[in-house]
Amino acid sequence: LVFTGSGRVGRLLLEHAAQTNLKRIYLELGGKSPHVVFDDTADLEAAAQAVVAGIFRNSGQVCIAGSRLLVQDSIHDAFVEKIVAITQSMRVGDPLSLETQIGAMSSEAHLNRVLQSLESVKSIVAGGDRILTETGGYYMHPAIVTNMGPKDRLVQDEVFGPVLTVTRFTSEENAIDFANATELGLSAGVWTSHLSRAHRMVSALRAGVVHVNTYGGADNTVPLGGYKQSGNGQDKSLHALDKYMNKKTAWIKL
């Protein structure tokens, strides 16, 4: 059985399999993926565009959505200004319109859950409000929340919506600690102009996919899978076929 969904349901499936026929269970249970932006990033404008697209496309309803932004302290304010400006320029509306950049949430119940996650947050610098109620659709302005600590609930919980949290960091070690400080580990993004730093970050980040100076790249020839409570097994590539096969060995003496 292969399941994509919440950790709660994934654990229930594992329990039922253990109590019944020991059916193999493979799980993809979402993520809380970080973008780590260092002050040596060569093109901060490109990084800002990628960060915004990485969280707000499909209204944040994507398993690898880059919902946590970690920015080095020396460029924090300037970078936040960039992403706020880009976000506020994006058009929210009818997904069938060619001018629309951000569509609706999947249901009113889900929209309300996302909005409720923002109710106790004080430092919203963009969005976070419901709009276009007259259309009967489930729309909101994408939200950016600053001054977040790595252990804050909004930083830890998968919102699965257009909400980006922003946290400052001071050093590479600090960034690694913050990026790994969740129970999920599906994807991550790193922005730096130093290849040696890129390799160190790829090795240190507890995520199944790490993007460097880009985000969201995918191909059917390479595996996609999570660390920690983002699940087990792999999708895509030849590795994904293993979970669908029962292997058998036969010894025959003639």
Predicted regions: what is each one?
Residues 1-4:
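Periplasmic-binding protein-like
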